Amino acid sequence: MVYTAASPGEAEIIIRRIFASGYPEKIILQDMIPGDDSHMRVLTAYSDQNGKVRMMCLGHVLLEEHTPKGLGNHCAIITEQNLPLMERFKDYLESVDFVGYSNFDIKYDERDGSWRAFEINLRLGRSNNYVTSAGCNVAKYIVDDYILHKKFDGTY
């Protein structure tokens, strides 16, 4: 669930209500990055069993859900390339020897011209069909890596 607050005081009230309802876990607070859905990107990557990134597919989110429980879920995505942005995430994944699929939600912050990652999902994202539509068969990377032991030449 995503909650938004206009001030620190409002955030404190929301947090108190959440815990008062019986929620026992930690809560993550994030800066609200201004901008509409077109500022969002989604990046899906596959890192092989040696921690090397074999595939990256960057999607430009055109439309997100705006229902209370659907907020933040992507509805319409087209692929694009932004090699400097993709390389930053590739470098990160390889620096931590990550293995498997990863999925990042990223938003452009026009306040300072930076890209902000909201999270990393250690799996394919809910909206990962854009990857297959772009020509990257998500099952093939696992088969090539673990069963066929194919060498990799890179796919972005």
Task: Briefly describe each language-model feature range.
Residues E25-K26, V99-G100, F152-D153:
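Short, structured loop/turn "capping" segments at alpha-beta junctions
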Residues Q30-D31, V99-R111:
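A short glycine-rich, hydrophobically flanked beta-strand micro-motif that places a catalytic Asp/Glu
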Residues G51, D112-G113:
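Glycine-biased flexible loop/turn sites that connect beta-strands or occur in inter-domain linkers
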Residues S21-Y23, R111:
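Short, structurally constrained coil/turn elements
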Residues V2, A6-G9, I13-F19, D31-D97, ...:
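ATP-dependent carboxylate/phosphate-activation module, predominantly the ATP-grasp catalytic core
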Residues D144-Y156:
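Peripheral (often C-terminal) accessory segments that flank ATP-dependent C-N-forming ligase machineries
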Residues G113-R123:
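A short beta-strand motif that forms the metal-chelation/ATP-contact edge
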